[in-house]
UniProtKB/Swiss-Prot annotation:
It comes from Geobacillus kaustophilus (strain HTA426). Its EC number is 3.1.26.3. This is Ribonuclease 3. Digests double-stranded RNA. Involved in the processing of primary rRNA transcript to yield the immediate precursors to the large and small rRNAs (23S and 16S). Processes some mRNAs, and tRNAs when they are encoded in the rRNA operon. Processes pre-crRNA and tracrRNA of type II CRISPR loci if present in the organism. One of its GO terms (cellular component) is cytoplasm. GO terms for biological process: mRNA processing; regulation of gene expression; rRNA processing; tRNA processing. It comes from the Bacteria. Its main location: cytoplasm. The active site is at D64, E136. InterPro entries: dsRBD_dom, RNase_III, RNase_III_dom, RNase_III_sf. It catalyses: Endonucleolytic cleavage to 5'-phosphomonoester. Belongs to the ribonuclease III family.
Amino acid sequence: MSKQKDKERIHEKRRAKFQELQNKIGITFRNEKLLIQAFTHSSYVNEHRRRLHEDNERLEFLGDAVLELTVSQYLFQKFPHMSEGQLTKLRAAIVCEPSLVKFANALSFGELVLLGKGEELTGGRTRPALLADVFEAFIGALYLDQGMDAVIRFLEKTMFPKIDEGAFSHVMDFKSQLQELVQRDGSGTLEYAILEEKGPAHNKEFVARVALNGQELGIGVGRSKKEAEQHAAQMALETLRAADQQ
């Protein structure tokens, strides 16, 4: 087989993979070159003697800013009682490298990255920093191709549900949020109590209750007393938010 036919076969195989990705996420790029560029590492550009700006670094720069804005807007609307400091801490946990790597892996982004041979041989395809950069570059490409609304719809399918499911609850201090809200409104006194402790010593489960002036606001379950109280406070915040909206 000639080198030209080899190149054509590789090109078609690559395009098929990018088409699979678009089918998977329910998005069809108007400019497929942007999509491919989002997955093009600088090592591939250097090796194939392409123009420097054809790698994904500029798209990564843009995607980083778009991601920060969309996540900030979502958190601002989702957690109306959360302080600026808490919002900043939560956003940082969501857009940090380990988090973005998980989202990239969930979509098998690593399989699509175009790498130079040296980068491939040294495990670049699974390198966390590279995968996080690709995720940001993809966001940048999607923004350029279809605008902010398309980015938000994509994140509503991939990232925002994880926030709702509590994937980042370890950095969310619900007890402090609840305390600040109660103090601000002058509503009274919060009291926490452990209602139940069950399970063997190596696998304990606790049930906590939080009450305001003796009236129950939330029940939470956790592997520790602290975790159970945090979950109870989270439920209490949701209860108060629902009451505010009525």
